[in-house]
Amino acid sequence: MRPPGSPELTPTPDAPHYQPGALRTPQAYVVQSGDALSAIAQKYNVNMQALAQVNKLTDPDALQVGQTLTIPLATPRPAVPGVKIIPDSELVYGPLAEKTDVQALIQSKAGYLANYSQVVNGDTLDAAQVVLLAARESSINPRLLLALLEYRSNWLTNPQPDPSLDEQPFGFSDAWYHGLYRQLEWAAIQLNTGYYGWRSKAVTNWILSDGSVVPIDPTINAGTAGVQNFFARLDDYSSWLKDVSPAGFYATYHKLFGDPFDLAIEPLVPADLVQPLMALPFGPGETWFFTGGPHLAWLDGTPYGAIDFAPPGDTQCGDESDAWVTAVADGVVTRTGNGEVILDLDGDGNEGSGWDILYMHIETRDRVQPGTVLHVGDHIGHPSCEGGDATGMHVHIARKFNGEWLSALGPLPFNLSGWVSAGTGEQYVGTLTRNGVILHNFDGASPDNQVQR
């Protein structure tokens, strides 16, 4: 953080990323097993809708192995200056995410949000509760979400905003992403996609809504990349240039919260970070099954930061398991609900600081309560199918540090009771290795994927 009264400084450039160019001649691509149209579009730096249109695909999800796709030429655009918009710590739900009282801010601005409510997961929530729920779930800074809402729809300060945006305040029209909560969820996906894509060097260009391909300035930071990608999904080229300029979204953020770089925490994730000791999430002597290799920590856009374990016995959804998911380390429970439990390992109660563990698919019955102090091996709850897509009862665990989702594939894999995670890069496919023994994940129970502490 910048000390009060000291001058504002220009953020330093990040180390440049390598940038390949856009296609110069049309190409053909033969669909392989496991391909998705979105991934093919990203690989060739073209707009997915344009790719579908050129190939007359009425259902983008119905690709056939061996099918030949024509890759259309993109509309190349010049790179834009490397203007940093926000630091990384202001994109994620980091150590200072709770600095702003969201409820008080919304009421003080007396805009549309001040009287807004929505039913989410069966509960009626006010606007502050909706924003905080979406922010914490996706690990996105609530200040960023509020500033984007204000920039796109004026919902924070205008009591009577444009009625055409009633159910889509970001201007993204989709039957699923309907209402404030789902719109925030959609925004989080775009922000995370840009942030972690830039972090992992998986993206080099933004594909705008008009099909333009804009090379990313190699010196921007991941937080800025997240914001640039958000606007890329909504804008044509001229609108995008304005939105990512100092006179665009940055000006709205600065007006609401001051210079975002005053709140920068750098580095957010130290290069020499070491995972603390963690145990497998079940009791000593028990045999569970490694059912899911590295896959999305949360929704689309997050890294492959989660792995799955299923208990012994019948694991059909709808049944109950009396097996116990346990604490992987000492900590305090900061949040529960809709299948989730968050365990804060530094014990300060701030989900955005230090190490935090997400447990997903924890049954409501016997689930641990917020504020409970736990020691390694203490009960969290029972594995189930609650809280999202699941083909059988299991527990999904993922890690965050200072609000950033950590990959289970990279230099900091899971180490649970000495079992170290690895993956192929294909979602859900991976291994656990300990003392030369290698377990391969399997969606079921087999001698080849059974694991013990």
Name each region found by the language model.
Residues 276, 319, 369-375, 398-453:
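Acidic, glycine-rich catalytic/binding loops that coordinate metals and/or anionic ligands
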Residues 31, 35-54, 66, 135, ...:
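Short alpha-helical segments in extracytoplasmic peptidoglycan/chitin-binding modules
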Residues 290, 331-333, 371-383:
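A structural signal for short beta-strand/turn segments enriched in small hydrophobics and glycine
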Residues 173-291, 429-453:
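Non-catalytic cell-wall polysaccharide-engagement segments
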Residues 82-241:
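Catalytic glycan-binding domains that act on GlcNAc-containing polysaccharides
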Residues 270-273, 277, 288-328:
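Short glycine/threonine/proline-enriched tight-turn/helix- or strand-capping micro-motif at secondary-structure
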Residues 13-49, 67-69, 73, 85-86, ...:
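Primarily a LysM-type cell-wall glycan-binding module
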Residues 320-370, 392-394, 398:
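Zn2+-dependent peptidoglycan hydrolase active-site motif and core
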